Amino acid sequence: MIVYSDIKRQFVNDVKDNSIADKILDAIKMRGLNAGHEKEYSSWQNSMQFMRNIVDDSEIDDEVRICIEYNIPLTSKRVDFIIAGADNVGKENIVIVELKQWQKAEVVADDMHYCVKTFVANTDRIVCHPSYQAYSYSCFLKNYSQSLTDESINLVPCAYLHNYQPEYRQTLSNPIYKEWFEVAPFFIKNEVAIFSDFVKKYITKKSSKGDLLYLIDHGRLRPTKALQDSLASMVIGNKEFMLLDEQAVCFDMCI
């Protein structure tokens, strides 16, 4: 389910005139979703300023699509931020951005490959590594959206921790998480230019296929051939299926 969706130019204007958080909240209420509490509202006010800085770039077409708080089908999970369009050669891409306001994090244990410890909701908590979170969301969408397969749309997961202090970067880049940050890179406070270049590698033009987000949201929802192959692989003992958020945390703590 799409919550907020508009072209880049309008998103930039919504942030500039300080109406973005209200628009997201109104859209969530209209759709009857259980979200929009005070801390979440504040996070929209904060994080959208940083994302505006990334997309408000002359190399990114004004009509590229922006989506905020996309509710993943069949789950209660939401993708923080999506940029949808095409690259310089016309290849359709959707960049999935997991946003975090963390300032630092810690490795929980050397055998816990999904999780880190950080200060969230007024206490230290064990949560998913942001790269894993972004990657798992992209896998779930890819496995269940037939439109992505039919239209050859590429998903590009990543994470942006715009408050994260550089001296703690080595925690998130610890080799135990390499499997995740190699497929879903993360960017921190002092890596604005690097993150901007990453986005522009995949998104500079509007899609020739129209609104990719609408296409996915209203497309066929069924297990794709890739998911069927993954399930078959699980039967013979290979771990294929992606765990989401709390599932991954529980798996790490129990194994």
Regions found by a protein language model. Name each.
Residues M1-Y214:
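Accessory nucleic-acid engagement/destabilization modules that flank
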Residues V108-Y114, R220-A232:
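Active-site-adjacent bridging/hinge elements
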Residues L212-R222:
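Short, structured interface segments
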Residues R222-Q228, I236-I255:
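N-terminal pre-P-loop "Q-motif" helix
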Residues L215, S233-I236:
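Compositionally biased, low-complexity repeat tracts
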